[in-house]
Amino acid sequence: MSTIKTNQLAHTANGASVFTLPTTDGSNGQVIKTNGSGALSFGGNTGSLQVLEQFFSPADGSAFSTSNGTITLGNVTSTLNLTTTFQDLPGSYITGYTPPSGTTQVIYEVQFGLRSSDSSAILGGHMVLDGNIILESRFGLRGSTNYSDMLYTFKFGINIGGSTSTTTGRLASWTSGKEIKLQLDEHDSSYEWVANILGNYGNAGHQGATMRPRVGITAIGTL
């Protein structure tokens, strides 16, 4: 295979600029930049925020290769009856995740089925990040006067930089693997909920079948 070598590029049109190429190759992920006078060089993309890494999937045991290792999701095969004690929501786990270098926010998202098995049932939930309950992730639901079926989406942005806060979920830095998950409970045995369930399904009526939650992350930042 032939090789052509040059240190300058120029267009033949009148008034065209002459560009001087870098003398060495750049690193993976770098872009070519100009200094405004025709000298080109490799450097990082310091522009606007962009998605650096993302996955979202049913909790069926799938594995995803990330910039810092493989993340394997849980495999949910049954529903969860809530109690008055907070329980981990099966399938909501993302374990050992480290975002790419340059990440300033990680968005954690879980979508799951719920069915109230009592009238006006009451539910509570929160996100747990690296073993800490995040105060501002708390949420509550109350069912209708009859049974309720719903597909609930929980979404929370974890900001990186500044001071760590278990109130807002902010992390000063994120350079090692952390676990993210949801926990749920119910008010009492007269206000019961079931999670990871498909209740009624249109014309097919009541199903009571297991519905795997969908879980994922989006890492946002600059290269």
Q: Where are the language model's segments positioned?
A:
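Extracellular repetitive beta-rich solenoid segments
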Residues: 2-48, 189
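A short, polar/charged loop/turn motif at coil->beta-strand junctions and beta-hairpin connectors
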Residues: 3, 46-55, 102, 211
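Short beta-strand element of the conserved SAM-dependent methyltransferase core
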Residues: 9, 42, 56-57, 127-128, ...
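Short loop/turn segments at secondary-structure transitions that flank enzyme active sites
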Residues: 10-12, 38, 60-63, 114, ...
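A short, sequence-level motif marking secondary-structure junctions
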Residues: 22-25, 45-47, 61, 139-145
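N-terminal leader/pro-regions and domain N-caps
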Residues: 45-75
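Terminal beta-strand-rich extracellular "head" domains
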Residues: 71-223
